[in-house]
């Protein structure tokens, strides 16, 4: 594999559009949303971006569900996303190189990185699975 493929912009990965929810959505509703089967998420989704006025304000992942809801035994009917999300997550753009995403995921122990435009509006999300699938295409053809 030629390491230069990691210099390609993130949009080469064809990242899926972001699943976004409002910061005041009850956790119980978000859990149902994360389980929904869609053409782009055939087994549900592991992360949802949280917005307020169309701007990214947080991310809620499966890890957040375990650490901030299940473990402390919070009432999912009375808790809203803004109380348990990861605030102001680190972001990238579709034009950033793939290697930036790998580095950010490695340093932050993330599996999902939000992609935003110049107004901080979500345009997608990149996952470790997206990167692994992209790299594997080049391994097979090598």
Predicted regions and their residues:
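Tandem CBS (Cystathionine beta-synthase) repeat/Bateman regulatory domains
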Residues: 1-142
């Amino acid at each position: 594999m030629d390491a230069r493929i990691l210099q390609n912009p993130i949009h080469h990965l064809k990242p899926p559009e972001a699943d976004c929810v409002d910061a005041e959505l009850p956790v119980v509703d978000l859990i149902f949303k994360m389980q929904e089967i869609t053409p782009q998420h055939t087994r549900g989704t592991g992360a949802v971006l949280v917005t307020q006025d169309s701007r990214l304000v947080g991310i809620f992942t499966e890890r957040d569900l375990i650490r901030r809801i299940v473990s402390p035994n919070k009432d999912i009917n009375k808790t809203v996303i803004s109380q348990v999300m990861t605030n102001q997550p680190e972001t990238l753009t579709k034009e950033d190189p793939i290697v930036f995403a790998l580095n950010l995921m490695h340093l932050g122990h993330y599996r999902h990185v939000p992609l935003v435009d110049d107004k901080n509006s979500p345009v997608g999300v990149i996952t470790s699975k997206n990167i692994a699938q992209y790299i594997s295409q080049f391994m097979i053809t090598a």
